[in-house]
Amino acid sequence: NLTISFSGTLDAHMNRLEKEDGRKMTNLELSLRTGLSDRYIQDLRKEEKNVSFETVCAICIGLHLHPKFSNDLISKSRNDYPLTEEGYFDQFLIEHHYMETLDLCNDKLREMGYRTWGKEL
């Protein structure tokens, strides 16, 4: 069940998802996929924090969330896609490249001259 909060929803996704090897998704694994610290991810799962749009997108791609779940998480983070060409491209990546790596998405963002998501790995 997904809650109405960002932190509760992120925690629920982390608890239900499995890595490729069938084991539970961990803060450390998501940290390795996004460049965000495992401590920061732990904090995001426990308490409501202001989180940037780019950080939420990095988490969505790192978890390979289906676009419906990504859009829900983005909304709960009190963010939205900017109504710009960059925002439309962000939405395109979330909706069509969610099974890719964050590195690949960031390469596409860089090619377009847009801000990258997460931290550089």
Language model regions located:
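Short alpha-helical "recognition helix" segments of helix-turn-helix
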Residues: 24-33, 59
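A short, Lys/Arg-rich alpha-helix, primarily the initiator
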Residues: 1-26, 102-121
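Short, basic-rich loop-to-helix N-cap that marks the start of a DNA-contacting helix
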Residues: 48-62
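Key DNA-contact positions within bacterial/archaeal DNA-binding proteins
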Residues: 28, 39, 68
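Recognition helix of helix-turn-helix/homeodomain-like DNA-binding domains
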Residues: 31-51, 76-78
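Short, leucine-enriched amphipathic alpha-helices that occur as contiguous helical runs
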Residues: 3-7, 38, 86
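Short, charged recognition helix plus adjacent turn
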Residues: 71-100
